[in-house]
Amino acid sequence: MAGGVTGGADGTWSDRFEQGLHPFIEVFNASIGFDLTLLQEDLDGSIAHARMLGSCGVISVEEAEQLVQGLETIRSEAHAGTFQPGLADEDVHFAVERRLIALLGPVGKKLHTGRSRNDQVGTDLRLWLRRRLDELEGDLQRLQRALVAQADLHRRTMIPGYTHLQRAQPLCLAHHLLAYVEMLERDRLRLHDVRSRVNICPLGAAALAGTPVPIDRQQTAKALGFDAIYANSLDAVSDRDFCVEFSAAASLVMAHLSRLAEEVIAWASEEFRFVRLSDRCATGSSLMPQKKNPDVPELVRGKCGRVFGHLQGLLTMIKGLPLAYNKDFQEDKEALFDAFRTTRDCIEAMAILFEEGLEFRTERLNTAVEQDFSNATDVADYLVAKGVPFREAYQLVGAVVRRCLDEGCLLRDLSLAAWQELHPAFEADLHDALAPQAVVAARRSEGGTGFDRVDEQLGRWLQHLNGTQPVG
């Protein structure tokens, strides 16, 4: 045919077409450059489909076994690097079918009986994403373990707590790190929840309306490990909600990683000096020899936008599509693949950073909490414990802070006599109550930063990540 190959396993769509594709359109239309990622899943789905055709009597059992052996041969060729699809194949499905026909002859042409690429690609995508979701859950737990290990080292290390990036109240460093462990646990559970909707099988929906071929959809779904089949064939081939859901869940993972990355970047700066970056996770400057740049967290923070962009792209792709399948769906794959790879890589990078790439400057951190007014709330709490109404105590302490700022001193610098001039409820135990260790230890409410509560939280997480008990 003139003008290039029109596609299909034998180089043609059908006798419906008299001319080949324009050479540019052939390239523009092809997805083989990226959907070959789905090869293993395509082979798995085709093997299950072939066996089902044989058991239902659509083809002979012998033919089904030939198809299975041919598909396994293609798998072996792929592992050996000898399976080389070309542009003429258009996509992974045609590439497999073309090679199968080359291996088996006419029997290879029977594989696609009772099936369309529409339900085939939906099945492949779900199989691929199901595996990737399982991997991401493990990756998140690795990062959680790294954070918990750091928290375990710093059960009694303190760090300034901030609101509005202003010093607020002192915290236990372990408590701060465990906040991210909690975020990541929500992410892990969210991804696990997405998996339940990924794990529904569209195979057998055919192009959009089902098939007159006497197939057994339940058999293929069970063989492939799906929990259920789509109840509506039109919905089965039209659904890309699971791609959007994954991208949304991945976006939240990235948002949490970006927040953690931003804190590491700040902590590593000369202005904070809370962490020291190792040479294995930092780079230098081509001009300024003194620099040690936090490239790892900066890249994580920067890559966050890629995953957010894929979510927006997928939402935009599906919003105006009529039922059922549309070529627009070809755009789901690169977005999905890159969202996964970016999220996975960023999780691993942050895990390495906390496993071996940074060291908390304990002395600096414990000193930092002594050099501010973050114990002001505790003065108010002290008065409340003595029977003073909170709002009265709050206003009094605010006036004291103003006085200290004017005089260039801290609350700890005021004498007991000066305190008692302000209110007779102040007693000799005040200064002990204002010490950072006492301030942190006093936060004993459940989930608080008090050392005893943090020990409880850490114990629960250590057991959970070792698989001995759930978090709760």
Curated annotation (Swiss-Prot):
Protein name: Argininosuccinate lyase
Record-linked SUPFAM superfamilies: L-aspartase-like
Gene: argH
Assigned keywords, A-Z: Amino-acid biosynthesis, Arginine biosynthesis, Cytoplasm, Lyase
Taxonomic source organism: Synechococcus sp. (strain CC9902)
Top-level taxon in the UniProt lineage: Bacteria
Major localisation: cytoplasm
GO molecular function, one term: argininosuccinate lyase activity
Family: Belongs to the lyase 1 family. Argininosuccinate lyase subfamily.
Native organism taxonomy: Bacteria, Bacillati, Cyanobacteriota, Cyanophyceae, Synechococcales
Enzyme class: lyase
Pathway terms, separated by semicolons: Amino-acid biosynthesis; L-arginine biosynthesis; L-arginine from L-ornithine and carbamoyl phosphate: step 3/3
Pfam (any one): ASL_C2
EC number(s) from the headed UniProt entry: 4.3.2.1
Localization in the cell: Cytoplasm
